């Protein structure tokens, strides 16, 4: 099948209906059939089960339980240097660099608006103007829990409704404004080095996006942007330490981080197309 045909089919496919169906099947307990699908998936995508807390495919009652499997303690050591920002996920670096004129690079020849990505919030987008961004793509074989890259306090969460295109490299190179048009959950944190956004982007077959504080954010989907504000003082603050889990995909997709200007410098290991491991150096705080 040609690349043009693959892209064209995505425009025609009823992506929300397909994703709802996939979500229901992935959460269904189907006994031997579930186990057979899990074993096929492990073989097809070369999933490393040796690092899973429970490596037995038959131990997972649903495909979703397998997909968001925990790792063994110590499988992803967190860099303990306070000046180091760690990778939030096992993924592949899609793009990274400066936010120039309020735009992020999606792929060669494609840029999109930070304001659109953040649900149209002009004031929020201004906090990241001239800052840095990184886009991380989680493939089917990756560990699909998302962690905190640094110590932070949750300020705001925004649900932005949208489409559900695939987010693989082919689609990123061919669908304009992909990440600003797909459904997403925007999480805004305050850190010692300024504001940080960690954005969980949905895609075709991504049955749900969850956070540790709100549990399932989507589905159900909705027609309007929704915003939740969280206290920045007192007993009800939601605070995280570097390396703590903050969310997960069922099934996997993309994480985008935004950083304020003059706050971080990406690690020298960062390069488009390279794999990442949660907990390893992502960037360094500029002091």
Swiss-Prot record:
Is synthesized initially as an inactive proenzyme. Formation of the active enzyme involves a self-maturation process in which the active site pyruvoyl group is generated from an internal serine residue via an autocatalytic post-translational modification. Two non-identical subunits are generated from the proenzyme in this reaction, and the pyruvate is formed at the N-terminus of the alpha chain, which is derived from the carboxyl end of the proenzyme. It holds the Pfam family PS_Dcarbxylase. The active site is at 90 (charge relay system), 147 (charge relay system), 253 (charge relay system), 253 (schiff-base intermediate with substrate). Its main location: membrane. GO terms for biological process: phosphatidylethanolamine biosynthetic process. The modification Pyruvic acid (Ser) is found at residue 253. InterPro entries: PS_Dcarbxylase, PSD-B, PSD_type1_pro. Its cofactor is pyruvate. Its EC number is 4.1.1.65. The keyword ATP-binding does not apply. It catalyses: a 1,2-diacyl-sn-glycero-3-phospho-L-serine + H(+) = a 1,2-diacyl-sn-glycero-3-phosphoethanolamine + CO2. Keywords: Cell membrane, Decarboxylase, Lipid biosynthesis, Lipid metabolism, Lyase, Membrane, Phospholipid biosynthesis, Phospholipid metabolism, Pyruvate, Zymogen. It is found in: Cell membrane. It is a peripheral membrane protein. Pathway: Phospholipid metabolism; phosphatidylethanolamine biosynthesis; phosphatidylethanolamine from CDP-diacylglycerol: step 2/2. The keyword Transcription does not apply. Heterodimer of a large membrane-associated beta subunit and a small pyruvoyl-containing alpha subunit. NCBIfam families: PS_decarb. Catalyzes the formation of phosphatidylethanolamine (PtdEtn) from phosphatidylserine (PtdSer). This is Phosphatidylserine decarboxylase proenzyme. It comes from Aliivibrio fischeri (strain ATCC 700601 / ES114).
């Amino acid at each position: 099948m040609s690349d043009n045909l693959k892209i064209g089919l995505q425009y025609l496919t009823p992506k929300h209906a397909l994703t709802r169906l996939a979500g229901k099947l992935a959460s269904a307990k189907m006994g031997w059939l579930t186990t057979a699908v899990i074993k096929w998936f492990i073989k097809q995508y070369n999933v490393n089960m040796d690092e899973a807390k429970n490596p037995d495919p038959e131990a997972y009652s649903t495909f979703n339980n397998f997909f968001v499997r925990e790792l063994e303690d110590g499988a992803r050591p967190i860099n303990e240097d306070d000046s180091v920002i760690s990778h939030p996920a096992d993924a592949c670096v899609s793009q990274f660099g400066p936010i120039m004129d309020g735009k992020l690079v999606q792929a060669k020849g494609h840029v999109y608006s930070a304001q659109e990505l953040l649900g149209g919030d002009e004031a929020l987008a201004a906090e990241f103007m001239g800052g840095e961004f990184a886009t991380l793509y989680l493939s089917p074989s990756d560990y699909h829990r998302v962690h905190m890259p640094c110590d932070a306090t949750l300020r705001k969460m925004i649900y932005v409704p949208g489409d559900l295109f695939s987010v693989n490299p082919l689609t990123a190179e061919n669908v304009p404004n992909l990440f600003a048009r797909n459904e997403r959950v925007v999480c805004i944190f305050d850190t010692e080095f300024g504001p940080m956004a960690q954005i969980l982007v949905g895609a075709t077959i991504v049955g749900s996006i969850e956070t540790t504080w709100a549990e399932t954010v989507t589905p159900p989907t909705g027609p309007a942007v929704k915003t939740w504000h969280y206290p920045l003082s007192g007993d009800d603050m939601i605070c995280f330490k570097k390396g703590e889990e903050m969310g997960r995909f069922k099934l996997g997709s993309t994480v985008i981080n935004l950083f304020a200007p003059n706050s971080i410098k990406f690690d020298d290991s960062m390069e488009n197309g390279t794999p990442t491991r949660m907990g390893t150096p992502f960037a360094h705080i500029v002091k």
